[in-house]
Curated annotation (Swiss-Prot):
Protein name: Ribosome maturation factor RimM
UniProt cross-references to Pfam families, sorted A to Z: PRC_RimM, RimM
Biological classification of the source: Bacteria, Pseudomonadati, Pseudomonadota, Gammaproteobacteria, Legionellales
PANTHER family from the UniProt entry: RIBOSOME MATURATION FACTOR RIMM
Domain topic, free-text comment: The PRC barrel domain binds ribosomal protein uS19.
Length: 168
């Protein structure tokens, strides 16, 4: 889902209206953060192509956007389900110990006893703390993303060590 130079930030959904607007499913928080990026990379027919954002607005739970050279619903329909990415360099620098969710997805999760629990499939925002959705062949685990639970994250080794009982 990600490459070294691009970060997936959303997906084009379906046409909206008669003038080429498109509904967007945002993977950012808040969802309208996508609108801060004037040029998007769209994965259309398995190739990345730049498209300029002409306008956008919040239409919860979606965004609706107008992209350059997409002026009618028939053209917009061809972009349904295309992924939206931005260049990784367009993301702000993070403080030590902070991570973008996209960088955690796919990492192996191991507890402090060395037992492999699975890989990070996604994250959930709950209000009190974020939660790692960790999947293995046997099951799915919901592990709180807290300073107590998360012992270490090593992006180079692609591993997260957690204080978590293998039976939970």
């Amino acid at each position: 889902m990600k490459s070294n130079d691009k970060v997936i930030i959303g997906r084009l959904a379906r046409p909206y209206g008669l003038r080429g607007w498109i509904k967007v499913v945002s993977f950012t928080h808040p969802i309208d953060n996508l609108l801060n990026h004037p040029t998007w990379q769209i994965q259309h027919n398995n190739e990345w192509q730049p498209l300029k954002l002409q306008a956008g607005k919040l239409h919860e739970p979606f965004l609706v956007v107008k992209l350059e050279n997409i002026d009618d619903p028939e053209t917009a329909k061809h972009y349904t389900n295309d992924l939206i990415a931005i260049e990784r360099g367009a993301l702000g620098a993070l403080k030590e110990g902070d991570y973008y969710w996209t960088d955690l997805i796919g990492l192996a999760v191991v507890n402090t006893h060395g037992i492999e629990l699975g890989t990070v499939d996604s994250l959930i925002e709950t209000g009190s703390n974020d939660v790692l959705v960790v999947r293995s062949k046997e099951r799915e685990r919901l592990i709180p993303y807290t300073s107590y639970t998360i012992q270490s994250i090593d992006l180079e080794k692609k591993i997260i060590v957690v204080e978590w009982d293998a039976d939970f």
